[in-house]
A protein has these predicted regions:
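Catalytic metal-binding acidic patch
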Residues: 38-71, 131, 153
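Short, hinge-like loop/turn segments at secondary-structure boundaries
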Residues: 52-54, 76, 97-98, 115, ...
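Short aromatic/hydrophobic-glycine micro-motifs
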Residues: 32, 76-77, 162, 215
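Catalytic cores of NTP-dependent nucleotidyl/adenyl transfer enzymes across multiple folds
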Residues: 3, 108-267
Length: 267
């Protein structure tokens, strides 16, 4: 039984789903724009339904404080867990993530997330979902030892690839286009019968860029930290510059310390 398919269990309503529904009702009654992401949005685009232990809500960074205040005023517990990307709302053992960027600081929630949002029914309500392009963009960088979202990216490409706004997706990745290309290569390997889901012109353009790349011997920067907060710490200790810091990234030294100290803890 999945949360998406059933709101009720034997003997009454599932308390966790009731928490999600109450939280969504509260937000929907406010004037704060928000999007539903995570398992709910993933299921809408891929038809892959799986159990979830939390609810992911996406808001603009400028709306995070207002969002938490809505729940504070209604008796929920709130916290700004990681100031560069994540807050949480709790009631009892249940919680909701309030997301305004990605853990590496790259996928910041901006107006485009809302402009291109799709509508769907979530727990009986018509709500807006994170666009598939933004889901691919943010998930493509999640490559930890304990969590790799590559399969999610490939499933999104398989089911939504022909309808994606590819120019917009390429713009989202920007200078990080090799990350997108790596997933497109894997997609062709995993689904040889669905290669037409990815425009040939996109693959052709990216592979030409790859062929034109030259070694940058003087550029001692490690972009691996955009993919994993833990697996490239050795490289930083060896003198590489962390790509999450300006001018390449948007995190501060304090953000990095807090995010690194949380390694091994449940986010």
């Amino acid at each position: 039984m999945t949360l998406l398919a059933h709101r009720h269990v034997v003997g009454g309503e599932d308390p966790r789903v009731a928490f999600y529904a109450d939280a969504l009702d509260l937000l929907a009654a406010s004037d704060i724009p928000f999007l539903v992401g995570g398992t709910f949005a993933f299921a809408r685009y891929t038809e892959i339904h799986r159990e979830t232990k939390d609810l992911d809500i996406f808001v603009r960074r400028s709306d995070c404080t207002r969002t938490l205040r809505v729940f504070d005023d209604s008796g929920y517990r709130t916290e700004l867990t990681y100031p560069h990307w994540l807050a949480k709302v709790r009631r009892g053992e249940d919680f909701m993530d309030v997301v305004f960027a990605s853990g590496n600081g790259i996928a910041v929630v901006d107006d485009e997330w809302f402009t291109h949002a799709a509508e769907s029914e979530v727990l009986g309500m018509r709500l807006r979902l994170c666009p598939p392009e933004e889901m691919i963009w943010s998930k493509a960088f999640v490559q930890e030892r304990e969590r790799f979202d590559g399969a999610d990216v490939l499933h999104l490409l398989r089911e939504a690839g022909k309808d994606l706004d590819w120019p917009r997706l390429l713009t989202r990745f920007g200078d990080h286009w090799p990350v997108l290309l790596s997933h497109l290569v894997l997609f062709g390997f995993v689904y040889p019968d669905r290669r037409d889901c990815v425009p040939f012109a996109v693959v052709d353009a990216l592979t030409k860029r790859l062929a034109e790349q030259k070694q940058e011997s003087a550029n001692r920067i490690c972009f691996g930290t955009l993919l994993s907060r833990e697996q490239y710490l050795h490289d930083l200790a060896s003198g590489y510059v962390d790509a999450r810091l300006p001018p390449h990234g948007g995190m501060t030294p304090d953000d990095l310390r807090l995010w690194t100290d949380a390694i091994g803890k449940r986010t």
